[in-house]
Amino acid sequence: MFAPLLKKLFGSKNEREVKRMLKTVNIVNAFEEKMVALSDEQLRAKTAEFKERLAKGETLDQLLPEAFAVAREAGKRVMGMRHFDVQLIGGMTLHEGMIAEMRTGEGKTLVGTLAVYLNALSGKGVHVVTVNDYLARRDANWMRPLYEFLGLSVGIVSAFQPPEEKRAAYASDITYGTNNEFGFDYLRDNMAFSLEEKFQRELNFAVIDEVDSILIDEARTPLIISGQAEDSSKLYIEINRLIPRLTQHIEEVEGQVTQEGHFTIDEKSRQVELNEAGHQFIEEMLTQSGLLAEGESLYSSHNLGLLTHVYAGLRAHKLFHRNVEYIVQDGQVLLIDEHTGRTMPGRRLSEGLHQAIEAKENLNIQAESQTLASTTFQNYFRLYTKLSGMTGTADTEAFEFQSIYGLNVMVIPPNKPLARKDFNDLVYLTADEKYAAIIADIKESMTQGRPVLVGTATIETSEHMSNLLKQEGIEHKVLNAKYHEKEAEIIAQAGAPGALTIATNMAGRGTDILLGGNWEAEVAALENPSPEQIAQIKADWQKRHQQVIESGGLHVIASERHESRRIDNQLRGRSGRQGDPGSSRFYLSLEDSLMRIFASDRVKNFMKALGMQSGEAIEHRMVTNAIEKAQRKVEGRNFDIRKQLLEYDDVANEQRKVIYHMRNSLLAAENIGDTIAEFRQEVLDATINQHIPPQSLPEQWDVAGLEASLASDFAIKLPIQQWLDEDDHLYEETLREKLLKEITDAYNEKEDQAGIDALRTFEKQILLRVLDDLWKDHLSTMDHLRHGIHLRGYAQKNPKQEYKRESFTLFQELLESIKRDTIRVLSHVQVRREDPVEEEARLRREAEELASRMQFQHAPAPGLESEQLSEEGAEVAVAVAPVRNDQKLGRNEPCWCGSGKKFKHCHGQIE
């Protein structure tokens, strides 16, 4: 009630922050005259001076005014660009670990240099994160002269980079790269077998460009490093033949069935579900095709994998459409980012869905994969000591940035007031009427000599729009995922007089559309242009620039609303940069996805009440409000999904931190002999407790089982029963001491044979391999648990609490298995001395082989049998090799090794 009054009296929080920072801006400006008087050498020497002052105890905050003044003066001398006062506020916002929302064309890249320079002085490294390789290279090479003038080094990380080059890039003061590459390198570092193999230093400070795209849009897709699994292509092909025989079950809103069928589709949640008739029908078809045994249920535990394949096939056919969610290019299914319209090479959908789409499109089906390491952007970026970001659209997601990442959003005032006109939406009854109105608007704008940008949500819509324009004989350029390699060229001239560009949501994000076209791109296209040619090109551009401004600037037309207001705002933001004139208009129809699913009833009733006729449009603030309300509803649902994903991944993340800390400590340790000795005692105690329960009577002891377990775990045969028969003074405690001594003595003999140094090195290698293999299997188990945990809700249990409880139990079992399996392997192997050169060559071969099998994805992967611990050329010879029958052992059956334990408690743990 009093909030508007208080806001009027004291200003909003954002306004108060701007006022606070303006005081610092005045101090920076006061340094300007002094900086102008310095020579280049004196200005460059300021960097060394700042580092020295930091070492003596000054803070970055204390250095900020003078450091910003130095960076501003260097920008003038090197780049010919002086930071505006509002850009100084943007730099302070980034330094304070906040998100700076700045409109298109306000110079975000230049703003970043202020905070990056200041924080690079600490010597701990700064990461500048972009959405793609093109922007990373462009920005790094653009700003490199400025940083190098100030005595700072700049590196760029990219995929398929030689390791030495990548390490040098991370060792630089400032490192540019994509969010994917930073995340994957973090995972690779935690798979390294030595400290020298690691790439990243401590995660100190990151500036994320297009922060909303990375921390919001990408948050739902985990980063996965995976290895290939077994081939199931025949199964996908068989399932693909069956799916078209299923029909959709359709009910009207009142519950009246209009079409009997086998499955239902929920467009809001993008889910497809088999009904009872569908289950029976699919079981019959699977039985007939020989995929399901006679009388078997699809819901039997051993058939759940088959059920997953059926659902993958259903989703591939009914929810994923070519040229909307994916395209087919060079025999591969390339996913399309719904937020940017760009293809995502290398990304694959999880749970067999990608393979099901390949089967649907009659392509070569690639093998499934198993997760080797994974994380999410949410958890990766929260590892940085300080995080900040820049974007043109963040305020609509301010609550999520604050609640998930602890980042406040600061709206930076524009250097020049916005002159763009944003017209109300026009809503039509049908899509055909909408497209006719769009073409009429295009013709009118082009007649005026204005450039026009038409934004579409999908490739399908952009190509439909292109076909309509061809029929009208209107010249245009198309920019979508199919033609992304021409993106920079098309966007460069999208602001030329009368230019017409059709673009999916990507709309050349990160590249400004300059009114009149881009004269620098014209110069770059010439070979060795003369000064006269450059001057002529610039003069011609100036005329075109003025012509476009006088005609009204860039006109943005949107063919539909996106689910997110932020994406709509990004499209609008292509026009009206730096105070330029411009306009935007959204054209909608009741047949659009968003309107049909979320907003149609209210708007449809309103249109009926007005008695609208075909071809007429409604333009009313109430309609625009109804649509924005629908968008807020979708945004809220998507936020809940991201938050839920984070809550589940937080459980895995705590475990990930423990395992990675254990791994890093192991890599840093020179001698892990004491750790192995502790493992040995703990494993022995657990083994004894299993067969000789504490404080039990001798009659309850399972001596034969204990002898078998010791032979299995420690590769030692001890006559325990004979000892007990011969020595009346041998009771539980003294027996423990005797067993520990025998096992330790046996291991010490191995140490004498191999040499202490060789065995210590070998212990570290084995522990690393066991830890990695079991962690890999644990990730797969956690995936399966996560995907089925929602069913606990039917038993009146809280799925989240159940997941936490069961994952904790699984993690405890993992830690015990790491100890037991490490001791088992070390006890069974025979170690020989190896030539250091041979050893180094072997380790390099193994690392290269592992790297060649890796895939880098953004989707969880199903399980795979663990790789053998010993490889050809390794220095191990396993004394006991598993001998298996053709029939697979059940998890509760006695283990094949003769230990007397159940398979799941013995070799089943590592297989």
UniProtKB/Swiss-Prot annotation:
Q: Drop me one GO molecular function for this one.
A: ATP binding
Which major enzyme category is it?
A: translocase
How the cofactor is bound: the record states: May bind 1 zinc ion per subunit.
Task: Mention any one GO cellular component term assigned to this protein in its UniProt record.
Answer: cytosol
**GO BP term (any one):** protein transport by the Sec complex
Spell out the HAMAP family in the cross-references. Answer: SecA
Q: Which protein family is named in the record?
A: Belongs to the SecA family.
Q: What is this protein called?
A: Protein translocase subunit SecA
